[in-house]
């Protein structure tokens, strides 16, 4: 708000990374923090001149960034609801999830939405239960599955008491999850509208979908802000920390995690996908694993290499080509 207000008034604005001003605070013995001291420290940073400015992104980038971050929070809310649904099912019908490859398949959720509890499933007409299964699975599942589910409901060793309370909770949680699913769909459409305004080819990188590409672009903004791929790696906070003193040099360095958490999360998700995708990055992951690296360490290495690929694609503004970038 302050930036927008001052910009509208015609002031020249410099945005300074708060890490730089906060580092100056650590020089003082007393770690007091208030508005007056914060203003003084910012003035000191400017007086010493040892700072770099951060440029603000254009309006479309900022709008897309807001939507992507909001989507991330909605996804987190949906994940929490799924965990609560899963917990309730473990209590009242622990055998149910084993009937499907995933509890969240449309067939599974269709049955849950209709019956909610194992008692209701057990008492449901078999033909009615089968119709739901047939419809939701697009005729892939047979009557045998309906019989199997009803038998499991009859023989469950889940909690038998307070079924009404569990049923009420499930109904509310499923309704909320469905509502969030619709919100995510609407958000995806809005995000893609913004993404398509840019001449961006991040989605051509194997393992990076359209929404992931939009998230990464929104967090990076103008690629010209970064002098090299190493600078982008540092901005994402996936650069290793350096621990050296005299002749000692640490061999177990962790990621700095000092950059954008949203960018880091998006890159790591993409790196995880790339690690198992038929691509040069998959070969790189296997190479690290063959060297005895832990899965997370190998994925971190893939994330850094992927960030270099992202940098090249944005810098050159052209689609991903394995021979060019890897």
Describe the function of each predicted region.
Residues 1-326:
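A detector of single, family-specific signature residues
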